[in-house]
């Protein structure tokens, strides 16, 4: 797949194009230009390191939405075996913006749930751009309660702009569905591990992100509102999105300092989409460690700690 470059990555894109052109020449002629290709590759890596070492919150927000970033089903394919997807909320419909089911993680049975976006136009529409309706959250809760019934740990992957704000969703109880998930997750009698892999948009993210451990990928975001939405409310223009991103504190490092996130998972150079394999290794290592820790903690302590965590959200000094 041809890499997609964001606006601030254009210098990297230009070098990449030059490297591709030289590789084409190398293949078509007897002239050895491998040294020049290696020189440009090193220059590209150095430039990428330089750019990504000083990303602004607004730029990190762009990376978190990158169209080639791994989505929940990519993590399920890479980290789990024997995945059996389960469908429907048993009340209204099956929401394709939420995927989940039974799987094995290192041979251990678990329940995995996450938001799912689409790659092409047809799939984006089917997945509603990763914005769940109430039936999506009710499906997620049904799967989590199934996990509780059979004593299976729950792993969730968060990547959504937010809960879908359509009239139908509101009529079917969007806020009730989110609130019910928050309530039930604080009481779920199995370990719950949550990982923000892209966008963590408001209550739409939090509805599957109440857990014993909350992780964020290095270039993911987590916020009560998108920078554009915040700018539109406060400044009446989305052009102030960069200022809003700075003020909101949406980045993983910032949220870890506020004790809202346990672990910031390092991403490969250039972001998770540049190296799926390394990203999966990094995520798996963290989840393995946390699952072992969570299963060694007495259930009463686990539930108490989880409840205290969510009740501390919004407190600051």
UniProtKB/Swiss-Prot annotation:
Enzymatic reactions: N(6)-carboxybiotinyl-L-lysyl-[protein] + acetyl-CoA = N(6)-biotinyl-L-lysyl-[protein] + malonyl-CoA
Alphabetical keyword list: ATP-binding, Cytoplasm, Fatty acid biosynthesis, Fatty acid metabolism, Lipid biosynthesis, Lipid metabolism, Nucleotide-binding, Transferase
EC number: 2.1.3.15
Classification via Pfam families: ACCA (PF03255)
InterPro entries: Acetyl_CoA_COase_a_su, ClpP/crotonase-like_dom_sf, COA_CT_C
Alphabetized Gene3D superfamilies for the sequence: 2-enoyl-CoA Hydratase, Chain A, domain 1 (3.90.226.10)
Primary location group: cytoplasm
Subcellular location: Cytoplasm
Known partners and oligomeric status: Acetyl-CoA carboxylase is a heterohexamer composed of biotin carboxyl carrier protein (AccB), biotin carboxylase (AccC) and two subunits each of ACCase subunit alpha (AccA) and ACCase subunit beta (AccD).
Protein name per Swiss-Prot or TrEMBL: Acetyl-coenzyme A carboxylase carboxyl transferase subunit alpha
This protein's encoding gene: accA
